[in-house]
Design a protein with these regions (language model features):
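Classical eukaryotic N-terminal signal peptides for Sec-dependent ER targeting/secretion
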Residues: 1-7
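Negatively charged
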Residues: 8-135
Length: 135
């Protein structure tokens, strides 16, 4: 195995270089960067995009447990359809317009803890494919 191959293999180990996100701005920047490389699911961004605190982790495994505002996070990401059901949303208070115009998004996020959320306004506006319940 070459040194480059070893580095790339390590780079794709979930959590190898990851840290939690602490605010909406750094999470939104990482989403934008990741989806510029892999607009459908955020999987191929592993080892190719600089996703801030997530390092090279795939979007599905990002630690978002400290983020309180996810408003407009996937707004206008029309092709996005990643399984982000494992995200810890227990601290989130704002999900307003989170999937606004994310036309392809249709993943089951019903297990998300939304007890702290006070704003879900237009959360799924123009998210035509979405067909699950959340509580």
């Amino acid at each position: 195995m070459t040194v480059l191959a070893a580095v790339l293999a390590l780079a794709c180990v979930p959590g190898a270089f990851a840290a939690p996100f602490f605010n909406r701005a750094e999470l939104r920047d990482a989403v934008d960067e990741c989806l510029s490389v892999a607009p459908f699911d955020g999987v191929a961004c592993c080892a190719t995009a600089d996703c801030g605190p997530a390092g090279t982790d795939e979007m599905q495994t990002w630690d978002v447990s400290q983020v309180t505002d996810m408003s407009e996070l996937f707004r206008d990401k029309g092709q996005f359809n990643a399984d982000i059901s494992a995200w810890d949303t227990s601290q989130v208070t704002n999900m307003g317009k989170m999937f606004n115009r994310a036309a392809a998004f249709n993943q089951d996020i019903g297990s998300w803890n939304t007890a702290q959320v006070t704003d879900m306004g237009y959360m799924f506006r123009y998210a035509a494919a979405y067909n699950y319940a959340i509580t």
